[in-house]
UniProtKB/Swiss-Prot annotation:
Primary gene name: atoE
Any one GO cellular component localisation term in the record: plasma membrane
Chain ranges on the Periplasmic side, renumbered to this chain: 1-19, 75-102, 202-244, 287-313, 373-394
InterPro entries, per the entry: CHP00366 (IPR006161), SCFA_transpt_AtoE (IPR006160)
Protein name, as recorded: Putative short-chain fatty acid transporter
Transmembrane residue ranges: 20-40, 54-74, 103-123, 138-158, 159-179, 181-201, 245-265, 266-286, 314-334, 352-372, 395-415, 420-440
Keyword Transmembrane: yes
Amino acid sequence: MIGRISRFMTRFVSRWLPDPLIFAMLLTLLTFVIALWLTPQTPISMVKMWGDGFWNLLAFGMQMALIIVTGHALASSAPVKSLLRTAASAAKTPVQGVMLVTFFGSVACVINWGFGLVVGAMFAREVARRVPGSDYPLLIACAYIGFLTWGGGFSGSMPLLAATPGNPVEHIAGLIPVGDTLFSGFNIFITVALIVVMPFITRMMMPKPSDVVSIDPKLLMEEADFQKQLPKDAPPSERLEESRILTLIIGALGIAYLAMYFSEHGFNITINTVNLMFMIAGLLLHKTPMAYMRAISAAARSTAGILVQFPFYAGIQLMMEHSGLGGLITEFFINVANKDTFPVMTFFSSALINFAVPSGGGHWVIQGPFVIPAAQALGADLGKSVMAIAYGEQWMNMAQPFWALPALAIAGLGVRDIMGYCITALLFSGVIFVIGLTLF
């Protein structure tokens, strides 16, 4: 049954799902029109919101571009390629490859979402290289399906924000400790269930041998060696460019800073620390500054989609927040809920909002001020209410192509190649989220 559903979804998506840039443009227009219809905003005020928000994610866009290029450059170093090859060698058949990539991506995203997105896609590509008969789009989809675990992991935006002083709802409910969110029984159940169950779900998505998509071999070719051999009479400038001493000095600075950071902040991994770790590790493993720069240049081609689309989603987010549309959607679901159904209703409201605001932090700003007071009034569990917002966002990412962009950029595929599999994963993983929110 799962195989038939995934084949239907793949055919449907291939026919109807546009490029992610077109998807973002259509969402912009849809948000604009619905906000005019349901809120007292005027066309002029909506245009101003969109324009004011358009550049609000520049810093975040730069962070995401860096995590792609630094992660890609790190994986193209000889030691990391060797590690990925060793891990990928555990898969002997296409079925084992699919299950291994799903498991690997799920665990990696629990550790850190940025790390999981990038390394999961690279691992999927390595499995495709080593296992003949693999369906490459399915393997990349499996890496992205691992993203289902991120919101309940150590880098989940909402549980961390809810426990951080100064967050948007602290004045309403105080701080909500991670013991009530990340380390709660329901979150452990949901996260472990996703890690264990989803490999078996993706296993059943395997296409028939006659339907396996053949991929251009160029996509699976090993990257060229970025090292440069200098002639004996090379000028001082070139010797400096290929100097290992300079790399070691900068690497030592980065390691020293990271040691101080973790000693002060504990296991608080942010996107900035991931980028710094990727950059320093990549620099050291490529050995010379220019070898690393050549690896970065080869990776930079993958960032085009993110650089163009981030401003559109920034504009959509501000329209959702300032027009009150996000609050209206949240209130609709809250008004039909009681104490027992409140977490599930919050989950579905978050999933709907995620189409327009695919950002964990953005969800907390939009939904937190509505969800937390309602949870208090109904006597619902505050920690579960926070995580319901997070779960809705991470669940609907399977139908929202925005966060698939890093994996697709690394893989050299388009969104239509993987989204049929991802939507199938959305349908079956939803049961796990609802059970966890209802029974615990």
